[in-house]
Amino acid sequence: MSELSKDQALSYKDLLENVPCNLCGKDDYTVIYSPRYEQAATDNFVEKFRSSGDETLVDPMVRCNHCGLEYLNPRPRQNMILEGYSAGTDEKFVSQAAARENTFGKCLDLVEKYCPARGRILDIGAAAGAFLYVAQKRGWQIAGCEPNRWMCDWAQSHYGIRIQPGTLFDLRESADRSFDVITLWDVLEHTPDAKAVLLECARLLKPGGLLIVNYPDIGSWIARLMGRKWVFLLSVHLYYFNRATIRKILEQTGFSVRELRPHFQTLEFGYIAERMKPYLPWAYPVISKLSKALGLEKKLVPYWVGQTLVIARKNG
């Protein structure tokens, strides 16, 4: 019996654990947002942690009093998080494959300015493989890992690429200094131990190798403006970095930041409108009807609501 099945009858609070700051290790914090456990999906961690999961924040968010990192504490137990990510299907996520290919084509334009040789590239949390598919078409030697086996199978059947099921720490390709580039697209904030992930990235990268991370920036002007209504305040996001804390954790794990920039992503208009439904419930019916009437549902739309892209190099 899975942990999800055994714990199904427990209350949401019974499934939580306290964690220290991942950046400085201290356990001294100020609560930024109080919990809303009454809104939690207590019995469906597979639904909660699917790739298109959009449950608004129910766990308490805290800010470390020593380094300023913001994170969830307490949060769902690590085994629950990993099992939730590993199970289930997500047709909604893969419906946006073409839009994500559009985004990643532009991302690779930037990557190739820093690494024009197009060597070996590893995508962590590769989801359904859109980035790896685009990278392979452009001449990169690709590798990837993804905890959700259904996503791995989808990538194999639709793109013809193999993604290793599991986390970064399950990779069979584990030789030191194996890769020229490692990418984490909307991944680092989901990992239970972000620092451990970055240390493993440093081990796998060649000296001077490139690390690309994009993340929802809690320090962005739109996040500050929207407060608790910011669209990236989600239960699946365990860490909330700003430009200072992302720089600190990268420097602590052997990297030098070369560039920080706003990161635009592309999705279909209808998909974006549906994601906005919890925040604009009064407007969604009108927007939905108009988009259908005008044929806008499938239109690809670039959007920015606080995402930041970091380009860093491994020291040495």
Q: Over which residues does each language-model region extend?
A:
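Short functional micro-motifs and their immediate structural scaffolds
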Residues: D28-T30, L72
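Extended interfacial segments that mediate partner engagement and assembly in macromolecular machines
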Residues: R50-W150, W154
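Short Asp/Glu-rich motifs
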Residues: A40-D43, E83, W154-A155, S174-A175, ...
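S-adenosyl-L-methionine
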Residues: M61, L69-P74, W185, K298, ...
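Short, cysteine/histidine-rich loop/knuckle motifs that typically chelate Zn2+
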Residues: N22-K26, H66
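Short, glycine-/aromatic-enriched active-site segment of Class I SAM-dependent methyltransferases
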Residues: P35-F45, V213-Y239, A244-E251, Y271-R275
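A C-terminal cap/extension of S-adenosyl-L-methionine-dependent methyltransferases
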Residues: S2-N18, Y37-L57, R258-G316
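Conserved SAM-binding loop
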Residues: K13, E17-N18, Y29, G105-L225, ...
